[in-house]
Amino acid sequence: MSHLPLHHPAAVVTLRPLRPRAAVATRLRRHRLAGGPTRRLRRRPAVTRRRRPDRRFVRCRPSPTRRGLPGCWRHSSTGPHT
């Protein structure tokens, strides 16, 4: 087959690279067929307890009104729990 000019529609179709996800999947599948490494799910890091931001940097926000607390509980004498 002669070299197709790049603007030719067929050339556009053939030159589009394989979607990378698809390429990875086929590679892993081939591995498994060959007895190689089985597909490892991309491991999510273990969800540790989310660290609360340091209390000094927590913005002073109004209290949750559903608890009916007055104003900003950070600086109120009653504290977070009445």
UniProtKB/Swiss-Prot annotation:
| Segments for region (Disordered) | 35-82
The subcellular localization recorded is: Cytoplasm
Q: Name one GO cellular component term.
A: cytoplasm
Q: What is its main location?
A: cytoplasm
Question: According to the UniProt entry, which residue ranges have a biased composition of type Basic residues?
Answer: 35-54
Q: Which UniProt keywords apply?
A: Cytoplasm
Q: Which domain of life is it from?
A: Bacteria
In the UniProt entry for this protein, what further remark is given in the free-text comments?
Encoded entirely within Rv1078 (pra), on the same strand in another reading frame.
Q: What is this protein called?
A: Protein Rv1078A
**Species of provenance:** Mycobacterium tuberculosis (strain ATCC 25618 / H37Rv)
